[in-house]
Design a protein with these regions (language model features):
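Short proline/glycine- and polar residue-rich coil/turn motifs
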Residues: 105-114, 572-577, 756-760, 772-773
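Aromatic-Pro/Gly-enriched surface loop or interdomain linker
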Residues: 126-209, 237, 241, 322, ...
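A glycine-centered loop/beta-turn motif at secondary-structure junctions
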Residues: 199-200, 226-233, 285-389, 393, ...
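Alpha-helical transmembrane signal-anchor/signal-peptide segments
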Residues: 427-448
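Cysteine-clustered segments with highest specificity for TGF-beta superfamily mature ligands
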Residues: 759-791, 800
């Protein structure tokens, strides 16, 4: 596979003439293959140059990228000439007709070679881009690359392995509502900033030396996992080199190997009848806290799983490239169950702060500043009244009393000038004297993850017409805001200077009393939030109970606890304070996520307009909950969250070389992972205990207003893995305005087909439930509508009872 595009120096043509004819043929074939390589995800560009400098670049993950994601470009520069103070720029023409570019410095002493990443945001129009090497303003070399930017519905799986052929089946897995692609990678293809990892949906590592992972790559991987990524690591005989750099992330602390002669339980887990009876080597150890064994054989764990934030880590103790797993058809099902499920994340985790609607709450939040609002009507009326009184009656009375009424031709212009200065000074003082950064942040943290992912919307307000250099440090990466405040630089340009862990937007132009905005992504240390929450599945109804403690130094203002069944207001949670929780999991609607910010905050949007801070919180929360045009339909999913406002001002973004003021609004969200109690003869799994996934963005378990012609499929899976022997009961709640127009089906895992269900009742009890539930607890429901009639569906949820 051709990974890098090289610009090389070709010698004298006489040298070619002296080559042996066989060598010439080899070179010709190599050039031919390079010219054909775009069909295979790569590309080769040859550029003759002088000066002894070689430039190489590779795009994305094996040439793949995704729209509205960061693209990592790996660059290698080699200098065999004199010392060179160069810069490398990655650029492309954006959708507005301007140039989007990222530039970084490259100090190149003689006989040196440097490799680094340059990061650029793909705005939806990126297909071809250029990597240029500059000496000042002089272009030394230029390399042209192409990127295959995939739709977000496509599942991109990266593979790092010395035996990549064993993972060919990954391209055949079928995620719900999409297809998959496989990117063959090396360790040095992995970027050092987690924002650029988000193009990858999953990563498979087997028979590869991960001990060479840098600390930055490891941290980026952990943050990517917490954002929803999935990591699949295989053991086997070469487990030591495979897990050398991943040990802390694995659900198992591996200590030794063990030979077994049968993997029948793994076959049963994926419901594949193929025998797995040959001897194989397992890399085994002890389960870590919070990890779960999904498949066990002869007393040892074969397949285990561990949650990391929104993501998951799977560990397979056997080697897929060795017998009996090599060529086994069941691996496809195993990969699908592990990697192809993508339950929707909460809206704040995927919000872009953009909106195609008439009103963008993000812009309203940015504009909620006293400097951008009108002065008080009383103040304006009072000033105008004073002007009228002084100019008219008072001026006349004074002149008449002094018997100098002929001076009116002088006093009236003088008063006009004086009051004009007063009005101007009033307006100038009202809009302020220093620039202000309106910084709106939402921070998402998780149990056991030291860093919180932060997404920030930052507005730069200026009282005068000026240009500012805005710098984001500590790994934060800026991208354009598509709202009316988003045109930061002239001629639709978006130029970023990248240096170490910082990025700078030079010459951000702001008009008088105007504002420009940008979006930042990065991470900050998480607050120490502790809890004793548990879910007892042996009780009916199931609920989340326990205590939540704020062990941080910050007060969480207007805190609330959210579950799939609703939310509870906790008030201000001060440092060291604790609160008791008891909330049901039963859910017939995503009540929190379908509510607007006014209902959640208990405020009237119109009444709060004079209160700038309350108006800013209201608009920002509305923007956070509006992840897309259809977010009100499908935003609610599994999750227990502590939410509150806090005073935190450590966002590492500011204006270089200028004094500025800050207005910080921080919404802090901590995902709480309850302990699971599975005591009792029967476990009750309520609707709120399932994580769901839909084949259509227009459909959720709680709403389906626009049903596709082919119907929709909902995949339900227990949010926390549980082990059970059999299924005692499976019920479907299908509530609609016209039940006779609907046909419902359940997926039969034994026959591999859809079974039609009776829909004469809102609660449908499914017979022989064991056939319709996979060993991992997954169930699938399909609903088709008679297109000749209108139907509004308000519930497609399931409940389950299992025997542990």
């Amino acid at each position: 596979m051709i990974r890098f595009v090289h610009a090389i120096k070709i010698g004298e043509t006489g040298l070619i003439a002296t080559l042996h004819s066989k060598t010439v043929k080899i070179i010709f074939v190599a050039i031919l293959l390079a010219s054909l390589s775009p069909a295979f995800g790569g590309q080769r560009f040859v550029h003759a140059q002088n000066g002894g400098v070689t430039l190489s670049a590779a795009a994305g993950f094996d040439g793949y990228c995704k729209d509205k994601r960061w693209l990592p470009v790996r660059v290698e520069v080699e200098n065999t000439g004199p010392d060179l103070d160069a810069s490398v720029q990655v650029s492309y023409q954006n959708s507005s007709g301007g140039i989007t570019s990222t530039t970084t410095e490259a100090q190149l002493p003689t006989s040196s070679r440097k490799a680094f990443f340059v990061y650029i945001f793909a705005d939806g129009s990126l297909r071809d881009f250029t990597v240029s090497l500059f000496d000042g303003k002089k272009v030394l070399q230029k390399v042209k690359l192409s990127a295959n930017c995939l739709a977000d519905t496509l599942l991109l799986v990266g593979v790092i392995s010395d035996t990549p052929a064993a993972f060919d089946g990954l391209s055949d897995i079928n995620p719900l509502g999409g297809t998959s692609r496989v990117a063959q990678l090396r360790i040095d293809d992995l970027p050092e900033r987690y924002q650029a990892w988000r193009t990858l949906d999953a990563l498979v590592v087997s028979n590869a030396d991960t001990g060479v992972l840098t600390a930055a790559q490891k941290q980026a991987m952990e943050l990517w996992l917490s954002s929803g990524g999935k990591l699949f690591v295989a053991g086997g005989a070469q487990w030591q080199r495979t897990t050398a750099g991943l040990n802390e992330l694995l659900p198992v602390e591996i200590r030794s190997t063990r030979n077994v002669t049968d993997l029948t339980n793994l076959s049963a887990y994926v419901e594949d009848e193929s025998p797995l009876s040959s001897q194989t080597t397992l890399a085994v150890g002890t389960m870590r806290e919070g990890a779960r064994a999904l498949v066990e054989e002869e007393g040892v764990s074969i397949l285990s799983q561990k949650n990391v934030g929104f993501g998951e880590v799977y560990y397979l103790a056997a080697d897929p490239s060795a017998n009996p797993l090599v060529g086994w058809a069941g691996m496809k099902t195993l990969y699908e169950q592990s990697l192809a499920t993508r339950p929707p994340l909460p809206p704040w985790a995927i919000s872009t702060f953009d909106s195609s609607g008439y009103s963008n709450p993000a812009e309203q939040a940015l504009g909620a500043m006293k400097e951008l609002s009108m002065p008080s009507i009383l103040y304006i009326c009072g000033l105008l009244g004073l002007y009228v009184v002084v100019m008219g009656p008072l001026n006349f009375l004074v002149l008449r009393r002094t018997k100098r009424r002929e001076l009116a031709w002088m006093t009236i212009p003088a008063l006009v000038i004086i009051f004009s200065c007063v009005f101007y000074a009033t307006g100038f003082s009202f809009r302020g004297f220093t620039p202000i950064m309106n910084r709106l942040m939402v921070a998402q943290a998780w149990d056991g993850v030291p860093q919180a992912n932060v997404k920030a919307l930052v507005g730069v307000y200026s009282p005068v017409r000026a240009g500012y250099d805005v710098t984001a440090a500590e790994g934060f990466m800026p991208r354009a805001f598509s709202g009316s405040f988003g045109d930061l630089q002239a001629d639709n340009q978006w130029a970023v200077l990248q240096q170490d862990d910082s990025m700078t937007l030079p010459d951000t132009r702001v008009e008088i009393a105007g504002m420009k905005a940008l979006i930042l992504e990065g991470s900050l240390p998480a607050l120490p939030i502790s809890h004793t929450l548990t879910i007892d599945l042996g009780k009916t109804p199931s609920s989340v109970t326990g205590t939540v403690t704020n062990a941080s130094e910050f007060t969480l203002k207007d805190a609330m606890l959210i579950t799939p069944g609703g939310w509870k207001e906790l008030g201000d949670l001060k440092p060291g304070a604790s609160t008791d929780v008891n909330l049901f999991l039963t859910s017939s609607s995503s009540s929190f996520y379908s509510s607007n910010a006014g209902n959640i905050l208990n405020i009237n949007p119109i009444a709060i307009q004079p209160d700038v801070e309350a108006a800013r919180q209201y608009s920002f929360l509305q923007a956070v909950l509006s992840s897309s045009d259809y977010s009100y339909m499908n935003a609610g999913n599994w999750g227990v969250y502590l939410i509150g406002w806090m005073d935190r001002s450590d966002l590492p973004v500011g204006i270089d070389g200028r004094r500025y003021d800050r207005v910080d609004t921080v919404l802090y969200i901590h995902s709480l992972t309850p302990q699971l109690k599975t005591e009792g003869s029967v476990l009750n799994l309520p609707s709120g205990f399932f994580a769901w996934e839909s084949s259509s963005p227009l459909v959720s378990p709680y709403s389906a207003f626009e049903i596709p012609d082919e119907g929709y499929i909902l995949r339900f899976k227990p949010a926390m893995p549980i082990q059970f022997r059999s299924v005692q009961s499976l019920k479907l709640m299908l509530v609609s305005s016209n039940p006779s127009a609907l046909t419902a089906y359940a997926w039969n895992f034994e026959t591999g087909s859809w079974t039609r269900l009776a829909t004469d009742k809102m609660t449908i009890t499914i017979s022989n439930p064991d056939q319709f539930v996979a060993p991992n607890g997954e169930a699938r429901i399909r609903v088709v509508q008679d297109q000749s009639t209108y139907t509004e569906i308000t519930s497609t949820t399931i409940t389950m009872q299992v025997i542990p």
